[in-house]
């Protein structure tokens, strides 16, 4: 606690040449035509602020925002936290017939996919269920609103791309269809997976003589068309001749995706459904004099991987969809030592799950004496035009990570320079290679890094650098940030002296 308070005091006082950037970093900013006010940089070695440049400036953090979400989740939910998906019913099973509704309850399971659904449905068959004489109810009510994706405008010109998928509590396969395209000189063949009930695909793409390697250049946003109870995915644009490529697209409504996957999978197992597949908030038709329904019993369940494994996917690969789901989980779930997780009690004062999630993170920040002024949350992933954070706040989170019970789990979630994740191809020939653990972030006009860099004496430094400027594109911003990391990795055991990373006072 004393370290965090001392850090805040150092930043506020502008201690240790705080306003002055190292010559190496200042030169890189100048070469990239990025003005000093477009950069926010904090470097801490223990209790010493080596650099504090615009530390309190509220900036777009891009995906470094995920650090607020992931460290709060690790400390609030714990490393044993696992999300749940359940099949439940209140109906009896008689001669292979489930005489009532079957509920598929979503619990923000990061690993819910077609194979999990197959095994859960197989568990029903193993219990003797073949026919469902009722509805299958898709319960997404853990999050409020239950469908955060509905009514949201596209973030950019690629609404079908994975990074733009907006999760709900019952998202399966991240709502993606895998499409394989094989062309000859005259014909294009398409294969779409997974197999779904009454969902097909066709192409309106023209075959061209373009190189296969540049196939995405003339790809256009796919869409769907409905014909009665059938859905057709339609591809647009053009595609090279004599080319084989595959891609994943998000074009189906979340309800359609799960319903049609569930129907196809259940049919493969020899099952049938006499009723509808509907959402849990749809009206339930029941006789006025119907007897009280007993508490639903568990028929099948799936638990996600433990939280630290999910964090590695979020931070190493900057997975927006998983980060958004985890952010919402902070506002809807708590850890359970037996079940893995359970829903939080309702809070009438906080109407939406995002509000509860933000309250949870701000409470964690307050407990760690990290000032929340200027911090703006949207979805907790950084894929946002409105999320804001200061370099000092991110540095405070990283310091808290070093003092956490779960420091190893948190640090292991970060990309390793020149090794894996979003840092796999960066800093290969410098002293930070294999040693620095860095969360990256980028948007149009934004590039950022936040993490841990051992210096030349192997003393761990907290490093945050954010650039908000139109000139960060085409690698210019990345060069500056890599220069900051390199400067820290070459620095010695003393406080910073301008232009000399190895000097000590």
Where are these regions (language model features)?
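Polar, glycine-rich mid-to-C-terminal structural blocks
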Residues: 106-215
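Small-residue-rich helix-loop
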Residues: 50-52, 113, 317-320, 327-505
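Beta-lactamase-like hydrolase cores
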Residues: 18-46, 51-58, 118-127
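Active-site SXXK
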Residues: 47, 61-79, 136, 170, ...
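Short, Gly/Ser/Thr-enriched beta-strand-loop segments that form substrate-interacting elements
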Residues: 203-227, 253, 257, 297-301, ...
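Short, well-structured active-site flanking segments
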Residues: 75-90, 275-281, 407-411
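A small/polar active-site loop signature that marks catalytic segments
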Residues: 209-408
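Hydrophobic h-region of N-terminal signal peptides that target proteins for export
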Residues: 9-18
